[in-house]
Amino acid sequence: GVTLPPFDAKATGAEPRVPAIHFGTILTGDTFLNCEETRERLHREFGGALAIEMEGAAVAQVAERYGIPGLVVRSLSDLAGAESHMDFASFCGAAAEGAAVLIRRLVAVV
């Protein structure tokens, strides 16, 4: 398994915590989503997707076009339509550090 570095209290807006790693379906599209009702509806309609985001659509489109595998690694700070209690600048640094750990592990086995 992979253990990610913990987010500090400033990044989480609460207690320090170690991020969890999830594998599964992520919904992606070209529209910014900031509506809890829509997020919940999409979650129901698409079988419990783990997240909704925008950037992965471009990754998937390019991978499909060139016939290569694609992978999206996300660090999620909040739920669409919910108020975030995280400090965005602190979260970015912590998320980047965690992503680097994960990508190094992935590259080592590819």
Language model features with spans:
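Glycine-rich phosphate- or other oxyanion-binding loops that anchor nucleotides, phosphorylated ligands
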Residues: 1-110
